[in-house]
């Protein structure tokens, strides 16, 4: 079984107190060593839209949300009981239908709330601002990694609601929409149909396999961007390519040549 953590888990862990973090880390180590440990009190979340979400009891009130299948155990989120359950009820783990990348996706009800709330904030004297992506086809939006669940709402987004939506989208989709909104032309995401959704370059930005306790300890003791060397998918293709001899990477300033 592959043991993974997500950036949403490390972000939520960082918001807890020091003592709470220690308790959560202990449970995470126990899960990695023995996911069937009887003392972990795993509970299936029957009301979650994703049938593979489970909670792990950490003390009297903290709950660790995990995504559990026969092949994988993914640490997704941690918080106090009600907040943890609410987080799980609003999300599901999906494989993007066009890019093949694994994504933790917020449900449509949440997305609609953002667009509607921005609309009601406007006064009767405020001109209606144009939707930024109304003319874009579903196929094009999907090629940027926008989840299917979000297509209709993304087409309603104007400049006032763009940042709210972008904060809740997977990174590759968020970056593409922000670039489009500023006049850019982002490249479509790399499609890996039929492959391991967690091995996709975009999925590697948010999910990582923990091979041993030492690696997990490093991951939990530092912010996500500190312990993980992140390569943008455009950089990764140069790093992982096989060359017959010396190779030169060229590009304008700020394109990531030094990191490669």
Descriptions of predicted regions:
Residues 226-241:
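Pre-Walker A adenine-sensing motif
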Residues 205-228:
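Conserved adenine-nucleotide phosphate-binding loops and their immediately adjacent elements
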Residues 29-56:
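A short, surface-exposed loop/turn module that caps and links secondary-structure elements
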Residues 243-260:
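Walker A/P-loop
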Residues 58-158, 162-165:
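Enriched for short, Lys/Arg-rich terminal
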Residues 151-213:
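Interdomain "pre-motor" coupling segment immediately N-terminal to P-loop NTPase/helicase cores
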Residues 53, 226, 244:
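Short coil/loop residues immediately preceding or within conserved phosphate-binding loops
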Residues 1-29, 40-43, 66:
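Hydrophobic, helix-prone linear segments
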């Amino acid at each position: 079984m592959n043991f993974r953590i997500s950036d949403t888990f490390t972000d939520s862990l960082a918001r807890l107190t020091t003592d709470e973090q220690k308790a959560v880390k202990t449970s995470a180590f126990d899960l990695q060593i023995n996911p069937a440990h009887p003392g972990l009190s795993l509970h299936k979340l029957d009301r979650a839209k994703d049938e593979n979400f489970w909670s792990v009891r950490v003390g009297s009130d903290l709950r660790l949300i995990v995504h559990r299948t026969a092949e994988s155990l993914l640490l997704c989120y941690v918080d106090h009981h009600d907040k943890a359950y609410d987080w799980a009820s609003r999300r599901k783990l999906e494989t993007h239908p066009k890019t093949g990348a694994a994504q933790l996706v917020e449900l449509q009800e949440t997305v609609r709330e953002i667009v509607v709330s921005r609309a009601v904030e406007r006064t009767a004297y405020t001109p209606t601002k144009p939707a930024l992506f109304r003319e874009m086809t579903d196929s094009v939006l999907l090629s940027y990694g926008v989840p299917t669940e979000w297509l209709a709402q993304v087409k309603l987004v104007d400049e006032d609601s763009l940042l709210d939506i972008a904060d809740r989208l997977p990174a590759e989709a968020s970056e593409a929409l922000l670039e489009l909104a500023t006049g850019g032309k982002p490249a479509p995401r790399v499609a890996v149909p039929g492959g391991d959704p967690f091995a996709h370059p975009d999925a590697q930005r948010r999910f990582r396999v923990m091979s041993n306790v030492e690696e997990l300890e490093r991951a939990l003791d530092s912010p996500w961007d500190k312990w993980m060397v992140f390569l943008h998918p455009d950089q990764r293709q140069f790093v992982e390519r096989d060359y017959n001899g010396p190779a030169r990477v060229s590009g304008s300033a700020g394109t990531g040549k030094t990191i490669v």
